Amino acid sequence: MALETMTLSLSSSAMLSSGVVEDDKKQEAIVFPKFVLMGHRGFGMNMLQSPDEKMKFIKENSLLSFNVAADFPIDFIEFDVQVTRDGCPVIFHDIFMFTQEQGVIIEKRVTEMDLHEFLSYGPQRDGTNVKPMWRKTKDGRIFEWKVEKDDPLCTLEDAFLNVKHSLGFNIELKFDDNTVYGEGELRQTLDNILTVVNEHSKNRPIIFSSFHPDAARLIRNMQRCYPVFFLTNGGCEIYKDVRRNSLDEAIKLCKESGLQGLVSEVKAILRTPNAITRVKDSKLSLLSYGQLNNVVEVIYLQYLMGVEGVIVDMVKDISEAIANIEVTNEDDCEGEDERKCLIRFGEERKKVEITKDMITLLNKFVPKLL
């Protein structure tokens, strides 16, 4: 099914993405017309330390990665946006950029660079390589950023101008977990991002998301055209800000801030499946992310549990699995309008209750993965 069926509800300026008029501050869930598939950082994130060559195939968060992902039946790409010192929104996941000069590894904060310096890292459009890129893992190891198919760094504007227009953007508002931001600083960063979005979005489906509770709250207050989702580890990691430490805290934040839904680490959903009911009862939409989303069986399980979409790295493999789900629905709905049929199935998934049989399945299957 084409993504265009989602476009009105996610990008219309006349109506909120949740289907309420702009002067109505009421929070409502997004109604996705199908199970939603999103490519993580395009065609998938890079894990330079991984023995799996698929994790080192195409440079993440690049135009090449976005456009390769667009060749598959996915609905959105997810990518990370930060703002340079001179106010330009750029697409890059890590807080720090690493390079090597005369055998010494040097780091620099992305938001402390101007645009020209940021774009000087990695391969260039003219074929040169001005500054080699390295990457630091969570455990402190540093790897040269080598992938099979490299591509230059890009800006948010580049993505709008060069990626297939029907492909939705899940724009993650990226902030440093270890930095305390004032509201004025957050607003300035978000305003720079909104300026580009408003100028170039046209009718492209767009979602904003962020792990930063106040950034999510503010972007919702600063605009009413695009849905905002709160990203949460759901307690898989613990932070000083308690709003980040459980699914129930995430639900509370969404309700208080008028957000449309949350994007949870899949492990948190599998560990506390009854939280899905609380999400639905709160009229919130639920998506998931995490490495377990590269396991087909986990995707099927979430579909049955009522999760409405997933962010994945293995775009090719998982898109085929999702296609099988949708084909099954279409067969069951023979003679019905496709869109109405899939919405009906979506509504049924929202009403799914966690049964004893499902708990038994989770207890047998999930511990092997977590």
Curated annotation (Swiss-Prot):
Domain GP-PDE, residue spans: 35-322
UniProt-listed Enzyme Commission number(s): 3.1.4.46
One GO process term, biological-process aspect: lipid metabolic process
ATP-binding is among the record's keywords: no
Expressing tissues: Expressed in flowers and siliques.
Keywords, ordered alphabetically: Glycerol metabolism, Hydrolase
A Pfam family hit: GDPD
The reaction(s) this protein catalyses: a sn-glycero-3-phosphodiester + H2O = an alcohol + sn-glycerol 3-phosphate + H(+)
PROSITE patterns recorded: GP_PDE
Factors inducing expression: By phosphate starvation.
Molecular-function annotations in GO: glycerophosphodiester phosphodiesterase activity
SUPFAM superfamilies for this protein: PLC-like phosphodiesterases
PANTHER family: GLYCEROPHOSPHODIESTER PHOSPHODIESTERASE GDPD3, GLYCEROPHOSPHORYL DIESTER PHOSPHODIESTERASE
Similarity annotation: Belongs to the glycerophosphoryl diester phosphodiesterase family.
Protein name from the UniProt record: Glycerophosphodiester phosphodiesterase GDPD3
